[in-house]
């Protein structure tokens, strides 16, 4: 997909190198959080990695069955990445309910009472 632009809700394969510490690494599936309008204009996109190692952490979002990808979205590991140089490839699309649940967990994490 040479003209592919990642869009919110897409499941993509992306190179997560380099990484450090507890961050997810390697070529792996990730969920796109940002809309294609932003991604196309800026050349960056917001991603959350997907893991098959479900551990019951409070910020995991379980991916429903019936999709190509399985496991959980790590909503507390948001990354802004240059999707063009990281060999981003479309793989699947998650239902809107999954994106909504991911955003709810992010809102909880980022809550600010200033």
Predicted features and spans:
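Conserved functional hotspots at enzyme active or ligand-binding sites that engage polyanionic ligands
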Residues: 1-114
């Amino acid at each position: 997909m040479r003209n592919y632009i990642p869009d919110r809700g897409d499941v993509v394969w992306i190179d997560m190198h380099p990484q450090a510490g507890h961050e997810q690494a390697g070529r792996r599936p990730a969920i796109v959080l940002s809309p294609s309008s932003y991604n196309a204009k800026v050349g960056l996109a917001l991603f959350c990695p997907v893991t098959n190692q479900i551990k019951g952490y409070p910020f995991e979002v379980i991916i429903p069955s019936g999709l190509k990808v399985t496991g959980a979205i790590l909503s507390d590991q948001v990354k802004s990445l240059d999707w063009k140089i990281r060999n981003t490839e479309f793989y699947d699309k998650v239902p809107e309910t999954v994106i909504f649940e991911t955003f709810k967990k992010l809102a909880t994490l980022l809550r600010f009472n200033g």
